[in-house]
Amino acid sequence: MQSTSFFILTIVWALSIMCVTVSYSDERKAVKLPNPQVDNGRPLMQVLRDRSSSRSFSTQKISDQILSNLLWAAFGINRPDTGRRTAPSAVNWQEIDIYVATAEGLFLYDAKTQTLEPVLSGDIRSATGKQDFVKEAPVNLIYVADFSRMGTAQKEDKELYSAADTGFISQNVYLYCASEGLATVVRGSIDKQTLTKIMKLRPDQKIILAQSVGYPKK
């Protein structure tokens, strides 16, 4: 009897966790980010000198302004007349999407409108990597390649190009973080199968890397 009750309680607990982490929220609205501040920052050579990886994060929240600046630096539109971005992409496919996991939920960055589109409610940060620190970092970026935008390229070419393009974007994040005194680390240690299910990605959407961002722990 006790074992049966324990089993039932375990199932209920697991289902409740799943509901929190993967449920869609129809009532949530897009978050309009402030215009990115593009006329400040430190000299490039100093930023390159200070660029580094950090795996220790404060739980201090990142402001919407800093997040807007960060995402614009990563892969924002820097030439509005053509829609070209701050990082290059093969054939200008712009196949990389940036998903933003915070304590408030999972969002998709829309560079055209500088908004965060709600994807999932609930905090899924712990699912974005296998390291303990990912759940402490206030922002975890998930880089997802949409192969449907890459025309008739061969599968191996899509994988190569999207990996290279993600590298450009993640380095932009590194440089912005170095300029602003933020901590960051790009990560490949991800349970991609589980995270793909949580994010409800299509078969032609592939998780490439993730990147944690926050203030350094003091």
Report the location of each language-model feature.
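A glycine-rich helix N-cap at a beta->alpha junction
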Residues: 201-218
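Positively charged n-region of N-terminal signal peptides that target proteins for export
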Residues: 1-9
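Bacterial N-terminal signal peptides
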Residues: 8-19
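Short, small-residue-rich loop/turn micro-motifs
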Residues: 37, 143-147, 215
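Small-aliphatic-rich amphipathic alpha-helix that forms the alpha element of a beta-alpha
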Residues: 51, 70, 98, 139-143, ...
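Helix N-cap/coil-helix junction residues
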Residues: 182, 200-201
